Amino acid sequence: MDARADQIYNPYRVFTRAQWAKLRDDTPMTLNATEIAALRSMYDRLDLKEVEEIYLPLSRLLSIYVAATQQLYFAQRRFLGIVDRKMPYIIGVAGSVAVGKSTTARVLQALLARWSPRPKVDLITTDGFLYSNAMLERQGMMQKKGFPESYDLPRLLAFLSDIKAGRRRVRAPIYSHLTYDIVPNEYVTVDRPDILIVEGVNVLQTGRLPRDGKAVPVVSDFFDFSVYIDADEPVLREWYVQRFLALRDTAFHDPRSYFHRYAPLSDEEATATALAIWERTNLANLEDNILPTRPRATLIMKKGTDHVVETVALRRL
């Protein structure tokens, strides 16, 4: 297929970093360097330039999408002749382990919350909907933690359904990255936000089509917009190893850490351990479950080796 044909049939418009940065237009910078540093994960890179050139154009785009969705909502309400609660706008953020999803989600939350008028913007991660370690151990699934089958999908779908229905004080379980497990009897409460950001590796996952033709909901059915954070596999592998080494020198030293046993490892031993975990679990999950969902995203941000976004692909309407 020649370049022109590929452009015609490509469902995305692809922008270079420079092209995308120009779409910021006059969107104001509402974060300072200190606030940006606080949003950044310890093993990620984010600076004022990245926010200006990548996230401010995305914030502007999202403001357009949210406004259009609100107009459509009110038009539908007039058509149906009903008075209904305003439904929150839900944004999904997907991508591999170590790609920087959490940083992206936090930056979006901070920027969107400073729109005028100030909307209520909440953020949850799907980690809280993982089955407990005890359950995964009983099912022999600890090696597949993070795979689609390791999540309590009915509970996650019920949560999103309640949010979309406008219910008050909907609770989501809390996950501890220190203990690598669900925190018993602790929850975060989501109370009718204007915008909800849902971050997780498999949020764009689809299920198998039922043979009986019955509708089977998936998480992304509840999304109004979705972002996939992308990077080449060798780059992701290197970032995962770097993160593992950084955690070995910090969080792993806490006796409560699930990975405390790795704290004494040498650089060589820690690197070998991280690579083994990547190959056994994260790479398999990426290739089998995460990467195949990339074409379902509304927008794809592709990162280079230095953690900065190099290209942005926006799905055509």
Curated annotation (Swiss-Prot):
Its EC number is 2.7.1.33. It catalyses: (R)-pantothenate + ATP = (R)-4'-phosphopantothenate + ADP + H(+). Its main location: cytoplasm. It is an enzyme of class 2 (transferase). One of its GO terms (biological process) is coenzyme A biosynthetic process. One of its GO terms (molecular function) is ATP binding. Pfam families: PRK. CDD domains: PanK. ATP binds at residues 95-102. GO terms for cellular component: cytoplasm. Gene3D superfamilies: P-loop containing nucleotide triphosphate hydrolases. Keywords: ATP-binding, Coenzyme A biosynthesis, Cytoplasm, Kinase, Nucleotide-binding, Transferase. It is found in: Cytoplasm. Pathway: Cofactor biosynthesis; coenzyme A biosynthesis; CoA from (R)-pantothenate: step 1/5. Belongs to the prokaryotic pantothenate kinase family. HAMAP family: Pantothen_kinase_1. This is Pantothenate kinase.
